Amino acid sequence: MIFSTLERILTHISFSVVSIGITIYLITFLVDEIRGLYASSERGMTATAFCLTGLLITRWVYSRHFPLSDLYESLIFLSWSLSIIHKIFDFKNNQNHLSAITAPSAFFTQGFATSGFLTKMHQSRILVPALQVQWLMMHVSMMVLGYAALLCGSLLSTALLVITFRKVIRLFLKRKNFVHVNGSFCFSEIQYMNEKKNVFLNSLSARNYYRYQVIQQLDRWSYRIISLGFIFLTTGILSGAVWANEAWGSYWNWDPKETWAFITWTIFGIYLHTRTNTKWEGVNSAIVASMGFLIIWICYFGVNLLGIGLHSYGSFN
């Protein structure tokens, strides 16, 4: 009774704190001058990470197994992983515009975990015999850590594409407006326009330099985080194959979860391969990573929606 009450308290506190933190992030993202609010939001994310850690430990002690046996527990662990990656990311690179991209991931994941869709899973249950092995901790934890890192890296790549294509659209519209300028202007008007253009170009060059720095940071950090996630994902797939061989006598069975895990691994393997070619860095590799963002969610939730295959124990039903 005490553990279940403590679990509910930690769940509500973690979601409330991360909700307030996301609101502060949005304010500081729009109004960059308010530095004190950014520090408060980071303290909120730290508190969220501690609450989620306490929640996982409480559920572990109460259920007597590592909390990764169903969709609810894996979502809590995913939210914890996202918050930890966010804190590491913020420690290495203290930039509020990058933190504002990674922080909402923990918010939406935690929000879905505590929603009414998974109410039946909030109560801890006894593990089925197939899951009462040490491979559960090794395999599932590596997979979820891989999902968390790949999701963060994919979000950074998506942000890179948004910034880049927004710039391209603006340049296209400006060039189009320049073509439609009336040719009946006198010399003084043209000279006045050139002077305004020079002032505009000076301010634009500073803005472009800042945008270039942001794009470079997004590209660099997305590559680093995706590389880390790919290592976790590979370790999770290999440990799962060994576990499957011990449990079912076959390393690979091509059920829905395994198939989509292989597709996810292939997509991000292609991404890392494109990074070896300097011509494919930046936008081209970011497109591949953005595709991977959708693939990860299909892999993570697809089998839970279908409720079939060897991994159907984590379905909604």
UniProtKB/Swiss-Prot annotation:
A Pfam family this chain is assigned to: Cytochrom_C_asm
Intracellular or extracellular location(s): Plastid, Chloroplast thylakoid membrane
GO biological process, one term: cytochrome complex assembly
UniProt key word Transmembrane: yes
Any Gene Ontology CC annotation: chloroplast thylakoid membrane
PANTHER family on file: CYTOCHROME B_B6 PROTEIN-RELATED, HEME EXPORTER PROTEIN C
Its job: Required during biogenesis of c-type cytochromes (cytochrome c6 and cytochrome f) at the step of heme attachment.
Protein name: Cytochrome c biogenesis protein CcsA
Species lineage: Eukaryota, Viridiplantae, Streptophyta, Embryophyta, Tracheophyta
